[in-house]
Regions:
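Conserved AAA+/SF3 P-loop NTPase catalytic/coupling segment centered on the Walker-B
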Residues: 219-247, 282-291
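Conserved glycine-centered beta->alpha loop in an early N-terminal alpha/beta scaffold
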Residues: 1-138, 209-210, 215, 288-291
């Protein structure tokens, strides 16, 4: 078993009708006493020095004769370049090429239905997830494509187009936001109706550790809460900002030497996948943070509960579809790279508002590339006709751009007087300040932003707003 530069040996021992298995380093393999301990003292122990020498000779002879199989293991799932070719590795092996001796050594397990791979019903099961919310189909279409995008994280990164945003699913209590997010994102550990991968009440260190193991998949972080306690709120917001910046910048996080040594992990922890956050609130202030998040809003009643129950009961629908999708990407990797580069060139040549941050433009390019790849897959497999694929592609592109432009419009920096007015409006609604109305006060509804500069004047003591 090769784990980067470390080599471990897995030894199977048959002794007195019982089977024992041990994995350790070579020095352990040649240690006569330790190997005997593996058998719970059932093996006959010959204590003479010649016997021990013969044992070591026997082990060395097995190795020299090559009477073993070699297996290579990675500490994360996802795309690895193996023998010059990109391949997607999971704990059960390489997707699409199960005979290759490569696996990931992770706690999260990949399970799927082999007999349903490339099946029309499997595709339609996934495709119809877009209908989980007919009230806000834009949101569920975005989640569907974000789920597909996540399994290509490394490929986008390889081309210099890192997926530099996270998705936040924000909704009121009982809006089914967590359940909805789970059916779209839970690629691993699908044997039960599992909870989120991790929650915001976990430590920052625990959350950030997850970011490096979920390669080319989505890490779901649940339960962003509106704390009344200012200390808890500040702590949670600090963790939130760190998560958003990590995924937005995709810079490796450095661990301490001591932590790395104790836990046998690398000092540098790269962000390998995508992230979806769920919660009731999302209070972001800095522009640099706001532009790294695409927010999807859900309310109670937006999700079709009957359809949601179907996907909660059919746990293997998502990973079985993804097995087929990833296999297609593996077989057509050069075309996938071409589509990504081509979409970036096309999108960056379009006209967008002059004050629109490049992050939002690149987000459109990233999602556009995924949409094109998805419908290329659907058409090539015969799941959709050429006409049908083009119609859905156009519809999904409009949905995606609407959401991104909506996030841009809500995030753009306003002029100072507009920000003052927005702050005053919030303070009045929350009854944090009282309002004095002058006799000539008029209704402020419907004021245009371009008129704001002519409405506000300041003296040493007062802020005067003229209707």
């Amino acid at each position: 078993v090769d784990i980067k530069e470390e080599t471990e040996w897995v030894v199977d021992i048959e002794c007195m009708g019982r089977h024992f298995k041990v994995q350790n380093k070579f020095s352990f393999l040649c240690d006569y006493n330790k190997m005997l301990n593996v058998t719970a003292d059932r093996a006959y122990q010959e204590i003479s020095a010649p016997a021990k020498r013969e044992f070591r000779k026997y082990v060395n002879r097995l190795i020299m004769d090559g009477k073993f199989t070699t297996e290579y293991r990675y500490k994360s799932t996802g795309w690895k370049k193996i023998n010059g070719k990109w391949r997607y590795v999971t704990d059960i092996g390489v997707i699409g090429e199960p005979t290759l001796p490569y696996k990931s050594e992770t706690d999260h397990k990949f399970e799927f239905a082999p007999n349903l791979v490339d099946d029309l019903n499997t595709f339609m099961d996934f495709f119809n997830m877009r209908k989980l919310s007919e009230e806000k189909m834009r949101n569920t279409v975005f989640l569907m494509h974000y789920s597909c995008l996540s399994v290509m994280t490394t490929l986008f990164q390889e081309l210099g187009h890192g997926i530099n945003f996270v998705v936040a699913l924000i909704g009121t209590t009982n809006s089914q936001k967590t359940a909805t997010a789970t059916v779209f994102t839970r690629l691993y550990n699908r044997t039960t109706k599992a909870n989120a991968d991790i929650r915001f009440d976990s430590t920052e260190a625990a959350i950030l550790e997850k970011t490096s193991s979920y390669g080319d998949s989505i890490l779901m972080i649940d339960d962003l809460l509106p704390y009344a306690d200012s200390t808890l709120a500040k702590q949670q917001n600090g963790i939130l900002r760190e998560i958003i910046r990590n995924y937005g910048d995709r810079l490796p996080r450095m661990r301490s030497k001591l932590f790395s040594k104790i836990n046998n992990v690398e000092r540098y922890s790269p962000v390998r996948g995508c992230c979806l956050i769920t919660g009731e609130v999302l209070n972001l202030e800095e522009e640099s943070t706001v532009t790294r998040v695409i927010q999807l809003d859900f309310e109670r009643g937006d999700i079709n509960l009957r359809r949601l129950s179907y996907y909660q009961d059919n746990l293997l629908s998502l990973p079985t579809f993804m097995y087929s999708y990833i296999s297609f990407i593996t077989e057509n990797i050069e075309n996938i790279f071409y589509i990504i580069q081509d979409e970036f060139a096309n999108v960056r040549n379009r006209e967008y508002p002059s004050n629109m941050p490049r992050r939002f433009v690149d987000t459109i390019a990233i999602m556009s590339a995924e949409i094109r790849i998805f419908y290329t897959y659907a058409e090539s497999k015969g799941f959709l006709s050429s006409v049908g694929a083009q119609q859905y592609k156009k519809e999904d592109q409009e949905f995606i751009e609407y959401i991104i432009m909506k996030n841009f419009n809500e995030a753009q920096l306003e002029n100072p007087t507009a920000k003052i007015l927005a702050s005053l409006k919030w303070a009045i609604e929350k009854e944090k300040i009282s309002v004095y109305y002058s006799p000539e006060e008029k209704c402020l509804e419907g004021i245009k932003s371009e008129d704001i500069d002519n409405m506000v004047t300041m003296t040493d003591d007062l802020l005067c707003i003229r209707p």
